[in-house]
Structure formats: C-alpha cells, structure tokens
From Swiss-Prot:
Belongs to the RSRP family. It comes from the Eukaryota. Residues 37-104, 126-141 have a biased composition (Basic residues). The modification Omega-N-methylarginine is found at R147. It comes from Rattus norvegicus. This is Arginine/serine-rich protein 1. Probably acts as a spliceosomal factor that contributes to spliceosome assembly and regulates the isoform switching of proteins such as PARP6. GO terms for cellular component: nucleus. Residues 23-36, 116-125 have a biased composition (Low complexity). Coiled coil: none annotated. Phosphorylated. Phosphorylation at Ser-120 and Ser-122 mediates the interaction with spliceosome proteins. Residues 105-115, 268-277 have a biased composition (Basic and acidic residues).
Length: 300
C-alpha cells in the first residue's frame, strides 16, 4: 500500500479530521462514531447505576448486619446463661490445706473470685477430683480391697483396712440381749395346752378326745405339783378339774361322734325331735354353762 492510502485511512478513522467535514461520506462515518460513543456512555452509565445500586444495597446490608449479629449474640448469651445455670453445681475444687480443717475452696463458673464455704468433709466421698474433659464434679468413691488395703476414689490415697461400722451394728441388733434361749415355764405350757384343747373342741364339736402320752405325763406331773402347793390353789384346780370332767361327760352324752365306711368325716349325731321342738318353741337356744363346754372356755 502507498503512503497516501494509509494517511487517508487514518484520517477517515480519526473523528475530528477536516476531511470528515468536507465529504458527506466522512460525515456519515462521524455520526456513526458519535452514536457509538453515546451508546457506550449510556451503557457505561447503565452499568454504573446497577453498580451504585448494588453498592447501596451492600452498604444497607452492611448496616443491617450488626442487628442480626446482635440478635445472634443475645441468643448465644441466653444459651450461655442456661448453661451457666447447670454449671452452678459443677464447681472445680482447688486443692488447699484447708481440707484437714473442714473447709473447702471452690471457684464458681460465674465469678472469677474464689468463694469460701464451710463444709465438713464426708468420708464417703473421694478426695480425688477429675479435671479431665472439663468436668469438675464429685465422683463417689468405690471400695477396692486389695492386700488388706482400701483405695478410695481412683487410688490416689491409700487407707488401712477397717471394718465398716454398719455391719457391726447389724450384727449387734440381730443378736438378742440375753444369750440364753427363750424358755416357757410349766404354768405357761399348761395354759397353752388348755387353749389348744378348747380350740380342738370347737373345731371337732366334742371335747372327748385322747391326748398323747407326753401330754398325759405333763398333766400328771402338774397334778402332783398342785397337790404339794398351797391349799387355795389346790382347791381351785380341783374345782376346775371337776367342772371340766362334768362338762366332758355331758358333752359326750349329748354329742357322740358317728363313724361309718361311707363317710370318713367325723360328725355329731343329729338331735332328737324333742330337743328340736324345745329350741323352736323357746325362739333362741338356751346355753347351760354346766352342760355345754362353750361356757367353760378360758379367756386369753
């Protein structure tokens, strides 16, 4: 290409050239360049407007963000407060020499200053505190007996073997005060025998039954002792024995036990028609103390 053509091309491309004013073709190209520049400025302004809007929105968001952070902070604070309520009971105990005196220093999780409380050290709680995993609470001691020694807690302190007191107390309570066995006197035994007789007569409906040989021997020995005793007791026992014998005879005469092969249960005989008529006419059966054994029961 020649230098004239190059210069013409450059002048055509340049917007403020004198050839552009002279020639109409150059004026058309200038208008197109102006329109393109205007569209570029408009597009740049349009592009700048959203940027400004986005910047304003971002600024407003940045201004509104602290509010949300405040809310989150308040929520986190409330959660921490709830956690502190539960942490009140978990206190980290500081090791000090005041244990022997019965005092314990422990630091509350809410306050930094240590507080002093007077508490008596209980023997059932271990003196070893667990500081691992952030848990600071009392762990109850367990007894591990090895070679005559007892380890409290996690084996940090060793104590000599000692018997627990509650076992000794239970043994002393279970033992009776008097080491001699409980024995009944002969009088008490005879009273119990009479009560047993009365119960048997009530259950069977008759007082005519044979006693075993051991009880007969006891009755005979009791009669001999009563004869050697004072006269008043002897007379009272004789009257009691006489009334008992009379009542036994009358009961045997009134009610006799009937046994049969068909019926194995002992039942008294049925009453006569005369006795039944007397009972119905009187309305209520009359109990004679001398004839019936029920009037001679001994009160217990």
């Amino acid at each position: 290409m020649s230098s004239a053509a190059v210069s013409k091309y450059v002048n055509d491309m340049w917007p403020g050239s004198p050839q552009e004013k002279a020639s109409p073709s150059t004026s058309g190209s200038g208008r197109s360049s102006r329109l393109s520049s205007r569209s570029r400025s408009r597009s740049s302004s349009r592009s700048s407007r959203p940027h400004s809007r986005s910047s304003s929105r971002s600024s407003s968001r940045s201004h509104s963000r602290p509010r949300r952070s405040r809310r989150s902070r308040s929520r986190s604070r409330s959660r921490r407060r709830h956690q502190r309520k539960y942490r009140r009971y978990s206190r980290s105990y500081s090791r000090s020499r005041s244990r022997s005196r019965g005092h314990r220093y422990y630091r509350d999780s809410r306050y930094e200053q240590p507080r002093r409380y007077y508490q008596s050290p209980s023997p059932y709680r271990s003196r070893s505190r667990s500081r691992s995993r952030g848990r600071s609470h009392h762990r109850r001691s367990y007894y591990a007996i090895t070679r005559g020694r007892r380890y409290y807690g996690f084996g940090r302190t060793v104590y000599p073997e000692d018997r627990p007191r509650w076992r000794e107390r239970s043994r002393t309570r279970s033992r009776s005060r008097s080491r001699t066995p409980f024995r009944l006197s002969e009088k008490d035994r005879m009273e119990l025998l009479e009560i047993a007789k009365a119960n048997a007569a009530k259950a069977l409906g008759t007082a005519n039954f044979d006693l075993p040989a051991s009880l007969r021997a006891k009755e005979a020995s009791q009669g001999a002792v009563s004869c050697s005793g004072p006269k008043t007791e002897h007379s009272e026992k004789q009257t009691e024995v006489g009334t008992k014998n009379a009542s036994e005879k009358s009961a045997a005469a009134q009610r006799n036990i009937a046994f049969s092969s068909n019926n194995s249960v002992a039942k008294p005989l049925e009453k006569t028609t005369k006795a039944a008529v007397e009972e119905t006419s009187s309305g209520s059966p009359k109990i004679d103390k001398k004839k019936s054994p029920y009037g001679l029961w001994i009160p217990v």
